Amino acid sequence: MLSPRRTKFRKQQRGRMRGLAHRGSTLNFGEYALQATEPSWITSRQIEAARRAMTRYIKRGGKIWIRVFPDKPVTMRAAETRMGSGKGSPEYWVAVVKPGRIMFELSGVAEPVAREAMRLAAQKLPIKTKFITRQEEYI
């Protein structure tokens, strides 16, 4: 699963997800893409599950680009721990995804195959997404 090799600080504040994604909102690599329409934290496990669903469907054809990276640590306290005594330890990593963010790109396959692969990937994600093509993007 994806995670940073090293970070400057072990723990981060939660932050807020306001507004639309301005960076990472255009098709850069492939012909087809999966675009987020809701804000959410996407875990590294969810990204990996979506990637596996797509690669299993398209088999050996096509190329997939993952456009989100989980660089935010999520901390958790041990179960049944009293309040106080500091912040919990980092448990997993998430990618902060805002509406408009392109999460996956795909090329080298026909549009019906790409559409179905993206649908399978979208089922693994906790947010609503939409399928876009390079032609639709500039309309």
Curated annotation (Swiss-Prot):
Pfam families: Ribosomal_L16 (PF00252). One of its GO terms (biological process) is translation. CDD domains: Ribosomal_L16_L10e. One of its GO terms (molecular function) is structural constituent of ribosome. The keyword tRNA processing does not apply. Keywords: Ribonucleoprotein, Ribosomal protein, RNA-binding, rRNA-binding, tRNA-binding. The keyword Repressor does not apply. Gene3D superfamilies: Ribosomal protein L10e/L16 (3.90.1170.10). GO terms for cellular component: cytosolic large ribosomal subunit. InterPro entries: Ribosomal_uL16 (IPR047873), Ribosomal_uL16_bact-type (IPR000114), Ribosomal_uL16_CS (IPR020798), Ribosomal_uL16_dom (IPR016180), Ribosomal_uL16_sf (IPR036920). PANTHER family: 50S/60S RIBOSOMAL PROTEIN L16, LARGE RIBOSOMAL SUBUNIT PROTEIN UL16M. Part of the 50S ribosomal subunit. Binds 23S rRNA and is also seen to make contacts with the A and possibly P site tRNAs. Belongs to the universal ribosomal protein uL16 family. NCBIfam families: rplP_bact. This is Large ribosomal subunit protein uL16. The lineage of its organism: Bacteria, Bacillati, Cyanobacteriota, Cyanophyceae, Oscillatoriophycideae.
